[in-house]
């Protein structure tokens, strides 16, 4: 798939909250996930490989007490990259309710996402 095709499929699945399917279908086995440096204070770290990325997602989900809503914008494509705006309204365990917004940038090689990087 081209970057545009990967981005379109990502968007279709994201609009219905199918994050597991996105990872299963669109990610390379050796993909990496990069968080901003300040995310470590929130218990979020970088991950390499799909097993580690899935565990990172599970750990984040365990921190969520209640999800009130969320969004993912349409992708913007540039070369082998696409980016989306994302956000969620959630109550984190022991931290109360908050609105989180970020930009996510994805790198595509040989029809698969090989890197995700988050900015917030």
PLM-predicted stretches and their roles:
Residues 1-32:
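Short acidic-aromatic low-complexity motifs
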Residues 24-73, 77:
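A solvent-exposed, acidic/Ser-Thr-rich amphipathic alpha-helical stretch
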Residues 27, 88-90, 104, 120:
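Short beta-strand segments enriched in hydrophobic/aromatic residues
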Residues 63, 90-98:
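Short, cysteine-centered beta-strand-loop-beta hairpins and adjacent loop/turn segments enriched
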Residues 68-71, 85, 97-104:
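Short, surface-exposed coil-to-beta transition loops
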Residues 77-88:
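A short hydrophobic beta-strand element
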Residues 101-120:
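Short beta-strand edge/turn micro-motifs at domain boundaries
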